[in-house]
């Protein structure tokens, strides 16, 4: 799980670049939709290693249940 954090942060930082591009406008030659498309593509590509590790480590099949609260007739669990 420790390896997922830097890859996820890289993905999120690359997704914030179009927001900052509207403030500074560094690319006057390229249109904004092309810049956003390229940034989202790079963010998707950088998120693939962590997604692959997540799937290969069988974490998506982990089931957990949290017993939250019990009253007289109601049993609340979060699953």
UniProtKB/Swiss-Prot annotation:
It is a multi-pass membrane protein. Its EC number is 7.1.1.2. One of its GO terms (biological process) is mitochondrial respiratory chain complex I assembly. GO terms for cellular component: mitochondrial inner membrane. Keywords: Electron transport, Membrane, Mitochondrion, Mitochondrion inner membrane, NAD, Respiratory chain, Translocase, Transmembrane, Transmembrane helix, Transport, Ubiquinone. Belongs to the complex I subunit 5 family. Core subunit of respiratory chain NADH dehydrogenase (Complex I) which is composed of 45 different subunits. This is NADH-ubiquinone oxidoreductase chain 5. The gene is MT-ND5.
């Amino acid at each position: 799980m420790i390896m997922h954090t830097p890859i996820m942060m890289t993905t999120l930082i690359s997704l914030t670049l179009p927001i900052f591009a509207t403030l500074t406008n560094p690319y006057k030659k390229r249109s904004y939709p092309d810049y956003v498309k390229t940034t989202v593509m790079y963010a998707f590509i950088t998120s693939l290693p962590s997604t692959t590790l997540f799937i290969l480590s069988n974490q998506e099949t982990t089931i957990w249940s949290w017993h939250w609260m019990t009253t007289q007739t109601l049993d609340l669990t979060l699953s």
